[in-house]
């Protein structure tokens, strides 16, 4: 299948005719080439919708298949007319290749990360992560799935024929404006799609089917279930398989969360059922649940989908395949959750807002908004930590950590549901709830580039609900705990000539400017006499375009050179 265009098919009632679910193509191997570009689709009558996508696609991108232990090389070409990044959501990679806001890809440039796949078999994804533009770019469609395979998963007798009995489902809900353009702040979202298809159907054989569920919405949580409350067998969380499959009828996923589930269609040939969201069962305060009463002057948040049950995907059951999977194993994989007694540190994070009635943000971690120049936590390599996150706001927040997967210790002191007891990187924290997570920071240390933690409601993230941690060598007691640099460099980005504001730099006979590239390589030192000038004019046009780190009299700053 090559670049798909969602055809406009309407009924006289204005409803969408059902359309076949599109299964994204896969890319596999050890070398991957991605090209992020502008495109468009015709979802509704009238103006076409402008999108961002990867490779030949008009919306979303291919599914990347990685094998644990492989060293992979990825090339990402930016052709969107703006700066972006690509974050490998859930993957345990070095900070320099994580794709956070410190790894900008300038328009027309190519970013070439390479790393060894250290993750367990599961479903991950990739999407933009540029500061203050994540929602704008991701909501337009710049995203795709990542499947990691390993030997443990390969030994299990479970469905794994991609597109036949192993089905990727990228579920989104978005708000379009009067011109049919996706709105990054979609609090009245009502357009539900799966793999970029509105009102989709899929033909599936009468046997066990594996769904890889991703909630790629900007803010809406889904309470997944099937019509007639058909049993769901949860086999995997964000970052691994569970020890045993867990039977349930509901799987709640907030933005960024994934789950791997099985359903048994044996004996259902010629029957139909629906994947649904039972949003009427979500608690108030969870975006997608019943709309909360709003204080005067608040923006509208009354999506017609809030608090109601609705269909997402129609499943039409067809004849069973040869070699069909008709049972599931009693046990899956071994897990070794970290023990609380081995934690060296407990960090307290409070989710706050400007006042108790705030519904639309901004929201904060410990009353602080995101600052690229502030490192919130320095974490020694190989340490095990507990993070206790308390939501003191009126709305639920999906809390996401980069770099590592965590285990949920408890929710308000109670064990989490069995389906949440695998490795995770996103956890939904409801109003007035405290969730404790435990994680180990291993393999990757970097004293220049931090990792992020943030809310995965994208407009909350872009409004500053994000913090940074840096994993440092265990013996790095000399790493300075600088909360914020006392000098400023501008314009940033620039084409090469920059002005450094020295108003708050400590007075010394000489001013030492040191420049490093994004890999920590020292490029140059510039020594200037301190003539009591309040600024320093530097010509850095000899540097190639990219990300640079400055140290001025021992203080750190980041700089992006762009033409």
Predicted regions and their residues:
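C-terminal outer-membrane/trafficking sorting elements
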Residues: 6, 16, 480-490, 494-563
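C-terminal substrate/ligand-recognition segments
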Residues: 347-408, 425-448, 454
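Histidine-centered copper-binding motifs that mark active-site loops
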Residues: 18-255, 261, 283, 292-355, ...
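Active/binding-pocket-proximal capping segment
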Residues: 227-239, 392-422, 458-459, 471-473
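Short coil/turn motif common to extracellular beta-sandwich-like domains
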Residues: 67-71, 205-208, 381-384, 492-499
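Short glycine/proline/serine/threonine-rich loop/turn segments at secondary-structure transition edges
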Residues: 121-125, 268-275, 444-452, 546
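A glycine-anchored, Pro-Gly-centered beta-turn/N-cap motif
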Residues: 122, 207, 383, 449, ...
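Bacterial Sec-dependent N-terminal signal peptides
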Residues: 1-18
């Amino acid at each position: 299948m090559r670049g798909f265009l969602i055809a406009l098919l309407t009924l006289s009632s204005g409803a969408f005719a059902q359309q076949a679910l599109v299964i994204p193509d896969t890319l596999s191997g050890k070398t991957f080439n991605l090209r992020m570009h502008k495109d468009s689709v015709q979802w509704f009558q009238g103006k076409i919708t402008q999108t961002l996508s990867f490779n030949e696609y008009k919306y979303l991108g291919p599914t990347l298949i990685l094998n644990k232990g492989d060293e992979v090389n990825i090339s990402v070409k930016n052709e969107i007319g703006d700066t972006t990044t690509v974050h490998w959501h859930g993957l345990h990679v070095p900070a320099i290749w994580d794709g956070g806001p410190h790894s900008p890809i300038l328009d027309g440039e190519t970013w070439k990360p390479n790393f060894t796949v250290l993750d367990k078999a599961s479903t991950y994804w990739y999407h933009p992560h540029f500061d203050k533009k994540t929602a704008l770019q991701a909501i337009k469609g710049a995203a795709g799935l990542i499947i990691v395979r390993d030997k443990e998963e390969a030994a299990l007798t479970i469905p794994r024929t991609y597109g036949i009995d192993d089905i990727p489902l990228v579920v989104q809900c978005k708000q379009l404006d009067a011109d049919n353009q996706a709105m990054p702040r979609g609090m009245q979202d009502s357009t539900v799609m799966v793999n970029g298809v509105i009102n989709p159907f899929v033909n599936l054989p009468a046997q066990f089917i594996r769904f890889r569920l991703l909630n790629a919405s900007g803010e809406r949580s889904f309470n997944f279930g099937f019509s007639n409350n058909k049993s769901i067998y949860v086999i995997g969380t964000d970052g691994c398989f569970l020890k045993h499959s867990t039977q349930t009828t509901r799987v709640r996923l907030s933005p960024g969360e994934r789950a791997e589930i099985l359903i048994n269609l044996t004996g259902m040939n010629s029957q139909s059922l629906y994947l649904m969201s039972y949003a009427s069962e979500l608690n108030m305060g969870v975006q997608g649940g019943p709309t909360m009463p709003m204080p005067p002057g608040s923006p509208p948040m009354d999506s017609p989908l809030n608090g109601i049950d609705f269909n997402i995907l129609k499943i039409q059951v067809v004849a069973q395949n040869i070699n069909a999977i008709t049972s599931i194993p009693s046990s899956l994989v071994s897990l070794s959750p970290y023990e609380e007694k081995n934690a060296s540190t407990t960090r307290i994070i409070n989710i706050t807002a400007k006042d108790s009635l705030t519904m639309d943000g901004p929201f904060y971690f410990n009353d602080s908004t995101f600052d690229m120049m502030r490192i919130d936590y320095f974490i020694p390599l190989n340490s095990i930590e507990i993070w206790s996150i308390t939501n003191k706001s009126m709305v639920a927040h999906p809390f996401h950590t980069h770099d590592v997967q965590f285990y949920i210790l408890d929710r308000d002191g109670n064990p989490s549901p069995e389906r949440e007891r695998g490795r995770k990187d996103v956890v939904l924290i409801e109003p007035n709830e405290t969730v404790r997570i435990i994680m180990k920071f291993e393999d990757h240390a970097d004293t220049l580039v931090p990792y992020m933690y943030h809310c995965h409601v994208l407009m909350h993230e872009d409004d500053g609900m994000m913090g940074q941690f840096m994993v440092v060598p265990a013996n790095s007691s000399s790493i300075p705990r600088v909360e914020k640099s006392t000098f400023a460099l501008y314009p940033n980005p620039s084409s090469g000539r920059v002005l450094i504001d020295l108003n708050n730099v400590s007075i010394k006979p000489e001013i030492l400017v040191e420049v490093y590239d994004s890999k920590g390589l020292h490029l140059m030192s510039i020594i200037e006499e301190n003539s009591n000038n309040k600024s320093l004019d530097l010509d850095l046009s000899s540097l190639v375009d990219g990300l640079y780190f400055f140290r001025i009299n021992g203080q750190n700053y980041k700089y992006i050179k762009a033409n």
